[in-house]
Amino acid sequence: MAIAGIATGATKGYVYTRSEYPHAIATMSEAVEIARAAGILGPSVMGSAHAFEIEIRSGAGAYVCGEETSLLNSLEGKRGTVRAKPPLPALQGFLGRPTVVNNVISLASVPVIMERGAEFYRDFGMGRSRGTIPIQIAGNVKHGGLFETAFGLTLGQIIDDIGGGTATGRPVKAVQVGGPLGAYFPRQLFDTPFDYEAFAER
């Protein structure tokens, strides 16, 4: 986030997380203090002329706050409802000021790209969906949990190879992709690549 802040001329960033995740909030708060003590945050980032600070904010956990303008309303202490666009947050966002809104996946990709280069990052994935993505596998599977993989694996590979198939040994009839507002994919669509464009086509 500090890199993104310096790149855009921002001096402060906010990490917005749901109040239902106290361990994540505590971990992030500790990480901010460590970064501040190491000079990565503060009035002179890494000894440079750039200042950047991070504040952790917790929200009430409304699902709609995953949408950027609703998130901004919540950050401002308002009800988490979607704002009309335009104006876009890049022009008029948090407290009416130009605002960059990124998810943690985008921000986590920045150091890898800066260290290894864009071509290295582009080697992972397919089409317009490049790099890696964290996926959570839950339910009747042998190996549930959080995994990081490149875009492009099929749903079948994710369920059968990474997840190990079902814990009960019964055949998989369908999987839900994308959380509460996602879609169900039957077994006959398990050849679908884990890729934004491929999902949009299905």
Q: Which residues fall in each region the model found?
A:
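Terminal amphipathic helices with adjacent charged low-complexity linkers/tails
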Residues: 12-32, 54, 167-201
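Hydrophobic alpha-helical positions that pack around
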Residues: 25-151, 163-166
